[in-house]
From Swiss-Prot:
Main location group: membrane
Name of this chain's protein: Protease HtpX
Topological relation to the membrane, as annotated: Multi-pass membrane protein
Organism of this sequence: Alcanivorax borkumensis (strain ATCC 700651 / DSM 11573 / NCIMB 13689 / SK2)
Active site: 148
Documented EC number(s): 3.4.24.-
Amino acid sequence: MMRIALYLLTNLAVIVVASITLSLLGVDSYLAQNGSGLNLTSLLIFSAVFGFAGSLISLLISKPMAKWSAKVQTINEPSNQAERWLLDTVKELSDKAGIKMPEVGVFPAQQSNAFATGWNKNDALVAVSQGLLTRFRPEEVRAVLAHEIGHVANGDMVTLSLIQGVVNTFVIFAARVVGYVIDSFMRRDGGGGLGFGYYIVVIVTEIIFGIAASTIVMKFSRFREYRADVAGAQLADRRDMISALQRLKAEAKVPNQMPDSLVAFGINSGVKQGLKALFSSHPPLDDRIAALQEKRHG
């Protein structure tokens, strides 16, 4: 379960860089119709094209970026019994979920963790940490793998991309409308074209709106963790899934060696209260355990 910080940062970076580039090329001035008013239809189309482009880029590079940043060693041919068991277990679970077997890898981290990523359910990657393989019982590892297979089978990355595309579109569109209104107010002489203030306002507003809108993406991320827990319980065993989450809770103080860009993709604990809870990609482990015990979320 490990996906979103890198994803959100990539999207935000694409939006800002694209905004600067298009402003330099004069696209914003064209959309402003020489100062006579914004063409909202053209602006909305423009926003959707570039909003979904950023989301698509993030989706397409998610697997190679995850491999690189987490130093994942993919297993093509098993070199020992543990690797053979890992491949066989992922194959069994993916067959049960009705998807093509993902690539399987191990990454060097003391903390028990795992993640799944990829641009579609039949071209995914499932990776586990050395710590997970060392300290978890086989039944618990299997439950964690089932959780990750659940993410893949549920198409979480594609759904996340669609949500992010809509959010990006809103950010690009709203930032330009705000920029145009403020720029028009500041330049009451009625001169044609856009002033320098417009470009500054657009960039700053995109960053602010982008951060605020990320709470929507994170809310979906928290919801999909509950669904993946249910998938783990169905593909493996509910008691083993609960046991795995309880062990993760017990290891909360183990140093996290996973790259910051991938922390949101892992089986990490969420924040329960305060402003940080809005930006947490995962629900608190206590809530996830309770949901499984009460058989909520399916």
